[in-house]
Every structure is written in structure tokens, then in C-alpha cells.
From Swiss-Prot:
This is 31 kDa outer-membrane immunogenic protein. Residues 48-83 are annotated as: Epitope recognized by the monoclonal antibody A59/10F09/G10. GO terms for biological process: monoatomic ion transport. Major outer membrane protein associated with peptidoglycans. May function as a porin. Disulfide bonds: none annotated. InterPro entries: OMP-like (IPR051692), OMP/PagP_b-brl (IPR011250), OMP_b-brl (IPR027385). Keywords: Cell outer membrane, Ion transport, Membrane, Porin, Signal, Transmembrane, Transmembrane beta strand, Transport. The lineage of its organism: Bacteria, Pseudomonadati, Pseudomonadota, Alphaproteobacteria, Hyphomicrobiales. Oligomeric. The keyword Ion transport applies.
Length: 240
């Protein structure tokens, strides 16, 4: 009987010791989901399309030998057409949300303006067309939200401008054509939105001035060309 009691006590102590060795694991804390951060820093390439228009001015003066008087005025040609092209650039985003960037683009253009019959006292026709143009610009932006940037932009503009004039009669005539690359400046603003970490959409406005040049400057006659226009376009960029 005594041996049975001793065996029972020994078994009870053994069970207690085993229970003390059992480790109960605590449930692990939930892991926080990674924060989806976006940075504008990096290079990109893209495409764009839009519409451009403006008023091309052509101041002129021609001496009318029959009436013995100087005929002067300006042919203000309303121009417009579609534009489309490609762009590439690089952005640097600062800690305060400011984004510094540089961008270049090249555009095909159908922007054309013409006028005919009895313009400013001269009979005939005048036509000017921007065949293509491009820009090299700086961009200064600010992140209104993590994925939305608004910016201003400006820099160098250049383009090929073709002009043809056949104005006046034999006594006071301006007949000429020109097909030259012109340089000027551009200034504008836009907004760009990151769809995801690689693709962005933008809308942009640019004012472009391709400068002034003499088309005719002989004797008592001259004809100048002043080409400037407004561009509104949308674009799609792929960010590296």
C-alpha cells in the first residue's frame, strides 16, 4: 500500500515537471503593410498630341511706281493645326516636394495660316506654315499630392517655317518664298499625374515665339515674318 502511494506521488511530480517545460507561444503582432511611396526622380520618355494656333504677322511696305506712293501695312494671318511628337526628360524630387527637371521635345506640325485677295491694299495670296518645331526646357514643379505635380516650364524653341507670298501687281509687287529654321523661346505650365510607378499622364500649355526675320528687304520694299503661337497638348510618359 505504501509503495502504491509513493508511486502516485512520484507520477504527480513528474506530470507537473513536464507541464512546466511546455512553452506557450504568444500570437505574433500583425505585420504593417508596406507604404506605397512614389518619387518623381528619374528619367522618362513619352508621346504627345494636341492643337496649336496663333496669329502670324507680316509687316510690309512696297513702293507703288504707278501711283508714286508707298503702300504699307501688315498681313495678320490666323493660323492653326494639329501637332504631335515625342519628349524625353529627367526629374529630381527634393525633400520639400519641389521637383526640378529638364525636358526636350520634337513636334510634327500642320499649323498653317493663309490670306488671299485684297489684303491690306494688295491683291494676291500669302501663306505661312510651321512644318515642325521643338523645345529644350527647364521645369520647376511642386507635388500637390504624392502623385500629382503642377509645374512651370520655359526655354529655347526652334522650328522650320515656310512662307510664300505673291502680292501686288507689277508696279508694287512682293513676290518671295522662304523655307528656314528659326529660333526663339517658349514659356508655359502644366500638370502631370502618376497612374502607377512607371506611367504618367500630363496636360500642358506652351506659348512659343519663333522670332522675326526679313523675307524681303530691297530698295523701297520690305516684308517681315513674325511667328508665334499657342499650344495645348496631352502626353503619356514612361518613367524609368
Amino acid at each position: 500500500m505504501k509503495s502504491v502511494i509513493l508511486a502516485s506521488i512520484a507520477a504527480m511530480f513528474a506530470t507537473s515537471a513536464m507541464a512546466a517545460d511546455v512553452v506557450v507561444s504568444e500570437p505574433s503582432a500583425p505585420t504593417a503593410a508596406p507604404v506605397d511611396t512614389f518619387s518623381w526622380t528619374g528619367g522618362y520618355i513619352g508621346i504627345n498630341a494636341g492643337y496649336a494656333g496663333g496669329k502670324f504677322k507680316h509687316p510690309f511696305s512696297s513702293f507703288d511706281k504707278e501711283d508714286n506712293e508707298q503702300v504699307s501695312g501688315s498681313l495678320d494671318v490666323t493660323a492653326g493645326g494639329f501637332v504631335g511628337g515625342v519628349q524625353a526628360g529627367y526629374n529630381w524630387q527634393l525633400d520639400n516636394g519641389v521637383v526640378l527637371g529638364a525636358e526636350t521635345d520634337f513636334q510634327g506640325s500642320s499649323v498653317t495660316g493663309s490670306i488671299s485677295a485684297g489684303a491690306s491694299g494688295l491683291e494676291g495670296k500669302a501663306e505661312t506654315k510651321v512644318e515642325w518645331f521643338g523645345t529644350v526646357r527647364a521645369r520647376l514643379g511642386y507635388t500637390a499630392t504624392e502623385r500629382l505635380m503642377v509645374y512651370g516650364t520655359g526655354g529655347l524653341a526652334y522650328g522650320k517655317v515656310k512662307s510664300a507670298f505673291n502680292l501686288g501687281d507689277d508696279a508694287s509687287a512682293l513676290h518671295t518664298w522662304s523655307d528656314k529654321t528659326k529660333a526663339g523661346w517658349t514659356l508655359g505650365a502644366g500638370a502631370e499625374y502618376a497612374i502607377n510607378n512607371n506611367w504618367t499622364l500630363k496636360s500642358e500649355y506652351l506659348y512659343t515665339d519663333l522670332g522675326k526675320r526679313n523675307l524681303v528687304d530691297v530698295d523701297n520694299s520690305f516684308l517681315e515674318s513674325k511667328v508665334n503661337f499657342h499650344t495645348v497638348r496631352v502626353g503619356l510618359n514612361y518613367k524609368f
